Amino acid sequence: MPPSTSRLRGEILIVLALSLGMSALYAIVGFSRRLSIETPLNEQQATINRSLADESIFDLVYQLLGIASAWAPVLLVGFLLWSSQKPHLGALGWSAPRWPDLWWGVGLAALIGIPGLGVYVAGVQSGLTVQVVPTALEQYWWTIPVLLLRALTAGVVEETIAVGYLYRRLSQLAWSPVAIILTQAILRGAYHLYQGAGAFVGNVAMGLIFGWYYHRTGRLAPLIAAHTLIDAVAFVGYPLVSADVVQTLGFAG
């Protein structure tokens, strides 16, 4: 028996309150606070990955705990949409991976990442975007593996919930594909608003492209691959780029 409309709405609110919806609220409040201070946006900084303890072992433990907790909403929506028939998570766009998914992911990463860098630079130069620090982690033996794991986590969490889960549940509420894609895109922009208005615009555009792709294919793997690749390049590549290039691109050094 399919869930009632009121139950679906309540479920969506709970899932978002435990994940990206709450992140969006924090980002909106954070952006409002940034606007309230005298320092221009493009002179402020937003650090994505930071050290959580002075001691290497405790920093690692905290990082892994943070990653594990981020996966909890994914497990929740997987539990809610699990089917006894294969593919068990087909309602979320999860099915057996295929090699073309990887190549589509690379293509989508290039389509989003290259123009996205331009949007970021333009946003910083115009004063609409803060200087982003992709990582401020100390250099330990575990730093790169943790950064890659964080990139994968961001890809899985955001695409599973913002795209796969919302598309399924909002479709059950008889929303049109256009309304669903717009909602997904605005949500994606909202929880990136802590980086400034430029990041909001860029991520809304990313959400529109990803939403359209999912509407046409119903496959989540290429989106996860693309998102993971974009974040992995930013997180791992940032410390390897010279200070001059970092400053030219508008990243905080």
Give the label of every model feature segment:
Residues 2-8, 51-52, 93-98, 133-142, ...:
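Helix-boundary and loop/linker segments of multi-pass membrane transporters
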